[in-house]
């Protein structure tokens, strides 16, 4: 996986991105039906698949590019909004940073110690990929031990 080769991140940057994500970000963790064409015949097959992604959207291109350069995962997309705002002027261009699946796990593990508002969804993604509680016979996890483990994972 590409994120395993990343250098360790500055703790201040991780805390800043966590705050930015709490305020401006969105996280999707759901299972739903998708149409896929991965066969030689005609038509599609329906599959029940997970949708796991996270994104930050704003009109400040510099901040979005900094997030992308700092995390070294995901992609940046420019979105022009059509129509006019309430004042009758044009909407500003929106910039979006987005990542999904294992890259989202990597980012969630970085943000977990500092997240507040989106903490529950972040923990759902981490638990989806790393169900450490299932390794224990009684399904109980010591919260302090888990916090220490997750705080130390990606940092110096």
Predicted regions and their residues:
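Internal intein/HINT superfamily modules and their associated LAGLIDADG
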Residues: 1-156
